Amino acid sequence: MSATALTGRERVNRMFARQDQDRVPRQDTFWPETIARWQKEGLQWDHHDVLRLLDADFAVLCWSWPPIFPGQREVLRQDAETETIRDAWGGIARFWKGRSGTPEHVGFGCDSREVWEKTYRPAMLAAPNQVDTKMAVSRYREARQLGQWTHLSGVEGFEALRKILGDEVCLMAMIEDPEWIRDVVAVHTEVVLRSWQAVIDAGAQPDGLWIY
């Protein structure tokens, strides 16, 4: 290994190759409240700037978790502290107002194979790409200048299943109707790959994928 400091890209590539590095590659994420507090205390940047300040080795170009009904956010009821909404995946959940936290899952619109095939499947396949390809390419070019390891990011099939069907329907269907489960995962994967391909076609050449 060279005695000079490695770039983030070199560092991460050496990590995957099980070679020595000058330090452990690093990356971080922040709760929205963390950045908001820092900004009140004098921070003049957003979380992307903070990652650059901390010499993060990774740079995410885009996030792909395809909504089935893009833009849908229907407030069903609310009180002083929470609001219950129908989201872009057709689910109903109760969220805190003004702060982050795990929502209470109230219900899921896709609760049967019939609903999936009649409404959700065609809507998901027909929805336009929700990834901002221009922003992704801009981040790619900036990351290359900074020597960072670039990646496309998204969620794998099980998380998509839980988001669309809910845990109870999802787990029962794995036993009772596995072909339906395979189809949901296949459609989700197809749409995610389509969105990533759009970023590549726009000019980005990412180093890899980071899938949650």
Question: Model segments located where?
Answer:
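Catalytic cores of TIM-barrel enzymes
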Residues: 1-212
